[in-house]
Amino acid sequence: MQIKHTVTLAALALAAGCALAQQGVSKTEITIGSIQDLSGPAVSLGKQARLGMMLRVDEINEQGGINGRKLKIIVEDSGYDPKKAFLGAQKLVNQDKIFMMVGHIGTAHNLAAMPVQFEKNVINFFPLTAAREMYEPLHKLKYAFSVTYFDQIRKTAPKLVKEKGIKKVCTLYQDDEFGLEVMRGGEAGLKSIGMDYTEKTSYKRGATDFSSQVAKMKAAGCEMVVLGTIARETIGSIGESRKTGFNPVFLASNAAYNDAIHKLGGKAMDGLYSSMTAQNPYLDDNSQPIRFWANKFKTKFNDDPSVFAVYGYLIVDTFAKVAEKAGQNLTTDSFAKVMDTMNTPPDIFGSPSTSFSPTKHMGSDAARLSQIVDGKWKVVSEYIN
C-alpha cells in the first residue's frame, strides 16, 4: 500500500509539473517561431525579415542569451499562401512547441494562424502586417508595433492631395484584407477633405498583369493613385503605367517600402511615395549607426539589408527586452504583464517611440513619407500624428 501511495503521489507531482510547464521555455532555451514568405510573391520581404531576425538572435546568444537561456527561432515558409500559413502555425505551435509567434508576414496569413496560436495561449507578437485586426479587438495575445495601413494612408493621402493640388484620385488594390485596408484608409482620408475616389480597381493576390487596371485608371484621368500593393505588384503596376504614358502621383503603404522596388523596378520607380516609419538601411547611409548596422548585415549574409531586415531585427530585439524584464519565470502571463507597461524610445532607424498598456496593444500611430529619388528612398516628411 505504501509503495502504491508513493507512486500515486509521484505521478500527481509529475502531472502538476507538466501542467505548470511553459511551452517553448526550458531551463536552457527559449523557442520562438515565425512564418515568412520564402518562395512566393513577397519573397524579397520574407527572406530579409528572416535574416534580420537571425542576426539579432545570434547577437543575443553571443551575449549570453536571455536570463541565461539561449534563444532559438524556427521559421516556416508560407509562400504567401494563407492555407500554408495555417499549416505552418500548426507545426510551430503543436509540434515545435514555440513560446511565441514573432513577425509573421501577411494579413490573411496572420488571420489564418492566430486561432491555432490562441488555442494554445501563444502570443502573436509584432506581425509584419499593419492591418487593424492585428490589435483589434483588444486581445491579451495580440501585440502590434506599426501604424495601421488604414491610418498610414488616411493621414498621408490628404497631405499629398493638398500639396500637389490634385483633383482626381484613384486606387489599385489587392483584393484581400490587406488591400482593402489601404483602399479604405485612402477613402477615409479623402472624405476628410471633401473628396472621394474617381475610380477603384483591384487584382487577385499573385497577379502579374495589370494592363486592364491601368487602362481603366488612365481613362478616368487619375492624377494620383493609392496603391494597395506589395513588392512585385507595385513594380508591375507602375511599370505598366509608365509604358502607356500614364504618370500620376503614386502613393503606397509601407508594405511597398523596401529597396526591392527600385532595385528590381529601375528608373520607372522614381517618384513613388510611400508611408513608412523605420528607414531603409543603405550601406552608404548618411547616418553612421545605420551604415555600421547595414555593413554588419552585409558581412554576415553577403546581401544588402532592406527595411524588412530592420523590422525582423527590431522585433526580436523588443521580444528579448521584454522577456529579460519578465525574469527567470518566463511565461505568457509574465511576458504580457511587462509588455502592458512597455515603452520604447526612437531607434537608430528613425522609428517613432512606442507605448503599450493593458488597453492599448498597438505601439504607435505615427507615419511619415518617403519617396524614391534617383533610385533610392529618401525621407520627405516629418511624422504625421
How should these model regions be labeled?
Residues 1-31, 384-385:
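Short, low-complexity disordered leader/linker segments with a strong preference
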Residues 300-309, 320-377:
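Segments of small-molecule ligand-sensing domains
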Residues 97-200, 249-274:
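Extracytoplasmic ligand/sensor domains, especially the bilobed periplasmic-binding protein
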Residues 29-31, 44-51, 63-135, 203-210, ...:
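Beta-alpha junction/loop-to-helix N-cap segments that form part of ligand/metal-binding clefts
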Residues 238-312, 379-384:
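Extracellular/periplasmic periplasmic-binding protein-like sensory domains
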Residues 85, 145-168, 208-211, 234, ...:
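Hydrophobic alpha-helical segments within soluble ligand-binding/sensing domains
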Residues 25, 29-54, 76-83, 105-108, ...:
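Extracytoplasmic "Venus flytrap"
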Residues 21-34, 62-70, 161-167:
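Immediate post-signal peptide segment of exported/extracytoplasmic ligand-binding proteins
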